[in-house]
Amino acid sequence: AKDYQDMSRKAANIISAQIIMKPNCVLGLATGSSPVGTYKQLIEWYKKGDLDFSQVTSVNLDEYKGLSPENDQSYRYFMNTNLFDHVNIDKTRTFVPNGLEADSDKACSEYNEIIRKQGGVDLQLLGLGHNGHIGFNEPGAAFEKETHCVDLTESTIEANKRFFESEDDVPRPVSYTHLRAH
């Protein structure tokens, strides 16, 4: 891609083709700065009548542990603000890991089951973090893992503190993430 706008448009083209070819597809979605332009393009095409999200299911890549869906730093909030509130997707078919579940193993197991019940992910949108992380999976992480908890590295905390009032507000020590499409 020539630049961010071109990359965003190309990614949106791939996603829209998936939705058109399989209206009841399962999209794996990402958060952060990488996909924002893609979501803006998808919203624009939806508003023009070119896309219909009514049968789409989504599963998000990750979530901070300890943040409620209403917290403006949660990835559920991010997805609502940057995509779901602007298209005709059925929010009961949009899934983000449960950041409020106290039992991390239970939260991971439940999210894995949600993904399995959807039949896996048809298309996964990913973004790359400043150090090459995908989701909260740092470089060198095993890609065959299902949903699991990870400790945020200091470099990821440093990069993500810009989204919070202070570095101390960045949720620790773990966050939920998955890469495997089941």
Where are the regions a protein language model picked out?
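Glycine-rich N-terminal segment of FAD-binding domains in flavoprotein oxidoreductases
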Residues: 21-47
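Ligand-binding beta-strand-loop-alpha-helix segment within the catalytic cores
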Residues: 51-123
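Generic structural signal for well-ordered alpha-helical scaffold segments
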Residues: 12-20, 43, 47, 80-84, ...
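N-terminal glycine-/serine-/threonine-rich phosphate-binding loop
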Residues: 1-27
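A glycine- and small-aliphatic-rich helix-loop capping segment at beta-alpha/alpha-beta transitions
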Residues: 41-52, 75-77, 139-148
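Conserved small/polar residues in nucleotide/adenosyl-binding loops
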Residues: 177-182
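Short glycine-rich anion-binding loops that position phosphate/pyrophosphate groups of nucleotides
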Residues: 33-34, 64, 128-133, 139
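Class I SAM-dependent methyltransferase SAM-binding "motif I" and its flanking Rossmann-like core
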Residues: 131, 135-176
